[in-house]
Structures are given as C-alpha cells and as structure tokens.
Amino acid sequence: LYAGVGGFGFTAAQAGAGSVIGVETSDEAVAAGNAAAAQQGMGSVEFIAADATQWVREKPAPELIIVNPPRRGLGPDLPGWLNECSAERIIYSSCNPTTLARDLAAMDSWKVDQARLFDMFPQTPHMEVIALLSRI
C-alpha cells in the first residue's frame, strides 16, 4: 500500500513472494511500476491506481502487507482495517516517526518485532524507520 513505483514490491517478488499487488494513487507511478515489471519479466507483480483505504475494503487481505505512507501516515481509517484483516505480518516503512508512533498506537492487535532507523538524509531532521509487525 502506498507503493510508489514499486521498490518494496520488486524486492518482495525477487525474495519469492508468490504475487505482489502495489496500490498507489499516482497514475504516473503505477504506469512506471507496471512498465518496470514488464521490462523485468515479473508477471507476478501488478500495480493498481487506487486509494489504499478503499482498495483494501474490496479485496481479501494478503499474508504480508507492506505500507509506505506519506509523511501524514496511514490516515484515520486504515489502522482499523489492519487491526481486523487476516494478514499475518506488516512491514511499515515510515518517513515520519511521529505519525508512525500514532499509527502503531491505533493498531493494537499488532506488535513491533523489529525496527530500524535509517539516517538517509544526513544533516537534516528527516529519517526513515522500518518496522516489522506481527499479530499479538
């Protein structure tokens, strides 16, 4: 969810994920992701232009969900769906530790198993955090 041009999705596919669906609101990012998948011969990777919160309500949950939301975080509705869905794991990539903490507090059926902070923008206050979540 919030797939961008597919960096996490391609990595998951290369690691052996059976199928990967990337959901992104940007038509340009979806087109770029689908073009890259075709160019790399990754038929199991597909990108869809849709709102993440709306899309998840219409589809069955996968075993693993990767979310990479914008700085504003997951929004008010997606954490509730994540609490109720049947997914076994979540990888949460965040560019804003404050909204990550807020979203995790709203996801009370999940626990953080591992987390890493990445200082990808030295000399700035910006950082990336990756958290691996599992069911409580």
Residues covered by each model-derived region:
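Rossmann-like S-adenosyl-L-methionine
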Residues: L1-I136
